[in-house]
Amino acid sequence: MRDQILMYFEKAAKSYSIAEFDCHFRKIKRKEHVAQYLEEVGLHNWSRAHMDGRRYNVMTTNIAESINSVLRFARMMPVVHLIGEIINLLVKWFTERHELALNCTTTLCPNFGEKKLRNRLEDAARMNVVKVNNAQFNVLDGYMDGLVLVDLTNNSCSCRKFQLEQLPCKHVVAVCRFLKVNVYSKASRYYTRKTWMDAYSDSIYPIQPHGMWDIPEDV
């Protein structure tokens, strides 16, 4: 039972829509004390469907934990040496990522945008689109999601994945294909190769040896 509750919790946490969340949370309620605890914590603190704002699919603090791991030995050094190690690390990361962005040949970042969008292009091929009006379209997904509503004026889909990720979901992709609209135009600029390059365009310079420092006389 414990493993099942963990599975339902993970599915509930990652659900995009309230309806999908409720489906999994009802199963968690079989353990009343677990459901009560999760409700007291606040659904918006752990549920994607209830969260405020957009987290772009990020659900953990792995970035902070990864940096702590990289600096685990440097953290034992004096503060000046620790700062030097952090700067050297940033120099290395910025250089490597700028090179990756320069060599990128796709419109979107390969792993976080392009790969997802291409998979959704394949999924969209089996969907039927019905025009409701000039802005809204019903999309029939015969595989999983049933009928969903896409609104291009508000850049929204009733599955909510488009709004939260800022990347076209498979239903929006299907509508773009139906209208012969470039699907890449619906992706947030934060996924683009240009933004990736701009993010790492500046240079970070390592600290020079102490003997080369230009220290003002009044310091």
Segments (PLM) and residue ranges:
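Hydrophobic, aromatic-enriched, well-ordered structural segments
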Residues: 1-219
